[in-house]
């Protein structure tokens, strides 16, 4: 089952990359177009939304000041840190996607993020990035689903200590 899931995710990713490369050749996407598409994609975790809807860095900027500015060592370092942050963010995308059924199960069993932290045996000293990623993904899932009208009045959605 996991193998078929991984194959399905891989095929979907390859198709998405092919479509993205074709659309880049056909028309250049502006920041406004990318931002307006946010209503069309409904993903569960906020991290996935950010990851899927990034604006291109080479988007045209109308200000002349930005065209005349030469890159300095500080700006170069800032670009590198953004790239490393993006790659670190994308590293756990598969982990968060594969844990969606787990998030659903925890939420259906009325578990708060504090309960999930105990379930994962996650303490302040725990360094395990996978467990931390799963926990932060559930916190986002929990906040999103507790904001729905039908879940607002649930007791476990009123928990603030996590």
UniProtKB/Swiss-Prot annotation:
Compositional bias annotation for Basic and acidic residues: 65-79
Family designation: Belongs to the RxLR effector family.
Induction: Expression is induced during host plant infection.
Functional description taken from the UniProt entry: Effector that enhances P.infestans colonization of Nicotiana benthamiana leaves.
Record flagged with keyword Secreted: yes
Lineage of the organism: Eukaryota, Sar, Stramenopiles, Oomycota, Peronosporales
Region spans: Disordered: 55-93
Keywords of this entry: Host cytoplasm, Host nucleus, Secreted, Signal, Virulence
Source species: Phytophthora infestans (strain T30-4)
Motif extent (RxLR-dEER): 51-91
A GO CC annotation given for this chain: host cell cytoplasm
Protein's name according to its UniProt entry: RxLR effector protein PexRD50
Main subcellular localisation: secreted
Cell location: Secreted; Host cytoplasm; Host nucleus
Extent of the signal sequence: 1-20
Domain notes for this protein: The RxLR-dEER motif acts to carry the protein into the host cell cytoplasm through binding to cell surface phosphatidylinositol-3-phosphate.
């Amino acid at each position: 089952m996991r193998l078929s899931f991984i194959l399905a995710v891989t095929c979907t990713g390859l198709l998405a990359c092919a479509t993205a490369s074709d659309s880049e050749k056909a028309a250049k996407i502006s920041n406004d177009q990318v931002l307006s598409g946010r209503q069309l994609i409904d993903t569960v975790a906020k991290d996935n939304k950010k990851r899927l809807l990034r604006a291109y860095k080479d988007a045209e900027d109308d200000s002349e000041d930005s065209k005349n500015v030469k890159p300095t060592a500080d700006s170069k370092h800032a670009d590198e840190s953004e790239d490393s942050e993006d790659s670190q963010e994308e590293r756990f995308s598969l982990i968060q996607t594969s844990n969606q059924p787990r998030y659903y199960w925890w939420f259906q069993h009325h578990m708060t993020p504090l309960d999930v932290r105990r379930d994962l045996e996650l303490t302040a000293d725990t360094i395990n990035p996978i467990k931390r990623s799963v926990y932060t993904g559930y916190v986002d899932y929990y906040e999103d689903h507790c904001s729905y009208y039908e879940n607002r009045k649930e007791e476990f959605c009123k928990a603030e200590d996590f």
